[in-house]
């Protein structure tokens, strides 16, 4: 347990880190290889899609606007949208409501254990992105996702509307 003094110090350093990140959040940021092709196929299929992230909205919106706006995500749900962070499923449930989709018929793709936990708690079909930012010592094989994708393009084979 942290005492109040330590929590205060942590919050101070977190705010300082976010100031630095704000000035450089687009540097060295690129979509994973194959993501653009996947998004083009999703858009062609007519499926709704979007992003649920733990990233604060001011950073997430900037990144999405810069890299993905032409692919027209249907939603961007950040912690400010629900007051909760993953693994709490509130953001995923909200995303499904925004596109009038039942969670049980919706897919959630994540590159972290908490993403898959949130998807499971929301009763969604989960896909672990093994090509993502996997923390050292973790394996998507241990996350109990319904599917594991080694590449973005492999995701198509798990979604019937895309595998035709």
Summary of predicted features, one role per range:
Residues 9, 28, 32, 71, ...:
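Secondary-structure transition/capping residues
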Residues 56-164:
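Asp-based, Mg2+/Mn2+-dependent phosphohydrolase catalytic module
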Residues 5, 41-42, 95, 161:
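Low-complexity, intrinsically disordered/propeptide-like segments
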Residues 2-5, 23, 27-30, 80-84, ...:
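Pocket-edge positions in alpha/beta enzyme catalytic cores
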């Amino acid at each position: 347990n942290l005492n109040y003094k330590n929590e205060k110090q942590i919050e101070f350093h977190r705010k300082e880190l976010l100031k630095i990140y704000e000035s450089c959040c687009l540097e060295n940021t690129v979509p994973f290889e194959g993501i653009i092709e996947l998004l083009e196929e999703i858009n062609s299929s007519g499926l709704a899609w979007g992003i649920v992230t733990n990233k604060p909205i001011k950073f997430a919106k900037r990144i999405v606007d810069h890299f993905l706006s032409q692919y027209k995500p249907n939603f961007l749900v950040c912690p400010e949208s629900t007051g909760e962070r993953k693994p709490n499923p509130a953001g995923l449930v909200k995303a499904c409501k925004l596109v009038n989709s039942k969670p049980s018929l919706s897919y959630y793709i994540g590159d972290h254990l908490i993403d898959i936990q949130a998807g499971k708690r929301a009763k969604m079909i989960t896909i672990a992105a093994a090509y993502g930012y996997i923390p050292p010592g973790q394996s998507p094989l241990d996350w109990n996702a319904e599917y594991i994708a080694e590449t973005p393009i492999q995701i198509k084979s798990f979604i019937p509307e895309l595998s035709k």
